[in-house]
Each structure stands twice: as C-alpha cells, then as structure tokens.
C-alpha cells in the first residue's frame, strides 16, 4: 500500500530536499554483468531469459529499504511491495507496459510474467499495478548491442530504471551491459552499488528447483 511520509522523518530527508527541485535529479550507473549462469538456466528450464533477469532484479532490490520509497510530485511515498515492469511489444507494433508483482517464488513470478505479458499482447493495453506497488522499470532492446540508456527522466516517471540490449557471447562467458538509473532523492550511490552487486550475486546463484 502506498502512503505519503514526511521526508524529515525519513533517512532520505536531506537528499529529498537537496534533489526534489533539481533539473535532472536522476543518476545513471553502467555495469557489465556476467550472465553465463542465467543463460544456462534459461536453456535448461525453458524459462524466458527476460523473465529470469526481471526476477533477479526484483530479488536483488527486495532487501534494500530505499527501493520502497519513491519521490513523486514533490512528495515522498512509501510502499510495502515491489513489482518489476517490462515492456511488451504487441502484434500490431506499439509497445505497452506490464507490471509483474515480485514474488520470492520464481515459479509464481514466472506464472504471473507469462500470464500478464500475454494479457498485454492480447488486449493492447498496459497492465499497471498503480499505488499498490513500487515498480522497478526495465527496457530491453534486443535488436542491437548497447551499453545502456541515460537521461531518461520525466516528473511523471521517477521510478528506478534498468535498460539493456543484446547479450554478448564470449569464448568462456556471456556478458550483458546494463544501465541503472535512479532518482537521487530515493537513494545514493552506496545503495545503488549494493543493488548492482546484489544483482550479480543473484544471477550467479540462480537455480530452479
């Protein structure tokens, strides 16, 4: 459930006052991930690579307190649940957004991912969870190799945002550059680095039981 909190009563109070009126309050960090393990799990399990990456993102974000607060509209909001948003390309061309509620149970998350992305494709309508969840936004540009995306900001969309392109196969490992953009009133570089390191650890330890 979403509720407004007083920034002064939050650990983010100073950062909120410092960054709430900044012209560009978002920071982008680029990191190259070793996703060799994730690709192997996808092949063995038959699960989609993008679904596995989205689950790993939710898993890495879930223990970090800052992911449950979000600055928007000059206010600071607190949530108690997370979702991962993915972009769905529909049959007639336009893309739509799809929020998938994060679950520690990867099988439940996979079921929701398949059901909801199929719903978006069939209806040509966004599926957004609204005020119930803080969504971590993602975008995948598999048509080309990119290092990431920067300078994506709107006062209407202050959510953390990860973007990546086609993964890169090497002789011994497969890598994927990812950009992570976050609102500086939501978190600092320390929390962002903790999340990115946690994402690599989650990918490394990925198993399907």
Regions from the language model: what does each represent?
Residues 5-8, 20-52, 68-84, 136-138, ...:
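Gly/Ser/Thr-rich phosphate-binding loops and adjoining beta-strand/alpha-helix segments
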Residues 27-30, 38-44, 93-107, 187:
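Acyl-group handling in specialized metabolite and lipid biosynthesis
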Residues 149-151:
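Core mixed alpha/beta domains of very large multi-subunit molecular machines
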């Amino acid at each position: 459930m979403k509720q407004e909190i007083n920034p002064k009563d939050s650990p983010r109070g100073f950062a909120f006052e410092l960054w709430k009126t900044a012209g560009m309050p978002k920071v982008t960090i680029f990191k190259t991930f070793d996703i060799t393990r994730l690709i192997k799990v996808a092949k063995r399990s038959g699960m989609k690579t993008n679904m596995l990456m989205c689950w790993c993102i939710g898993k890495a974000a879930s223990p970090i307190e800052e992911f449950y607060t979000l600055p928007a509209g000059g206010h600071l909001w607190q949530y108690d649940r997370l979702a991962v948003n993915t972009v769905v390309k529909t049959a007639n061309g336009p893309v739509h957004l799809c929020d998938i509620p994060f679950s520690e149970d990867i099988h439940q998350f996979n079921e929701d991912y398949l059901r909801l992305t199929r719903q978006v494709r069939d209806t040509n309508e966004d599926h957004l969870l609204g005020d119930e969840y803080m969504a971590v936004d993602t975008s995948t540009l598999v048509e080309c190799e990119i290092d990431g995306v920067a300078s994506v900001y709107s006062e209407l969309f202050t959510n953390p945002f990860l973007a990546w392109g086609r993964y890169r196969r090497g002789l011994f490992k497969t890598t994927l550059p990812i950009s992570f953009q976050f609102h500086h009133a939501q978190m600092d570089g320390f929390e962002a680095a903790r999340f990115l390191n946690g994402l690599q650890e989650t990918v490394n330890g990925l198993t399907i039981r």
